[in-house]
Amino acid sequence: MSRFHRYFKKCEEFALCAEVGDANVIQVEDVSERYTLYQIVVKGSGRMGKIFDSDYIVGDVNGVYFADLKEYLGHHTVFESFEPVQMYGFNTLDLKQDWDGKLIENSFQGDDKSWLVCFKGNPIINGKELRVMDYAKLENKHYNVQLNDAIVGVFTKL
């Protein structure tokens, strides 16, 4: 029985992945599948690195861990969970296309090169309640945000 489950959602200009797993699980990702630019860990902890490399990043989540993983593109990677984990990845569809990513904490000004993604909870954005893995193309306008302890990212095509 698998102790680590992966989900993938292809969107219009990017893809989202989700991983949910038990403690003490090792997951390997082949270079041909490595399109993740940003990792958002919402529960648990673990470490990730390039295979056969002694350098790795540790995500110890007391809140949220948001990591830029661009340096891992083009490499086989390995992830080890220290405790039950739930994490999401923001993936480019084209390795030549770069994106900027960040988590939002307040209301903000959007632009038409950006997308909003909900990773945890039920925030209210401009009066609309979102669910996990909901996403929307932004416009050049102001967005009123009520996070309600949710985790929401904004990703901008460069």
Regions found by a protein language model. Give the residues of each.
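Jelly-roll (double-stranded beta-helix
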Residues: 1-158
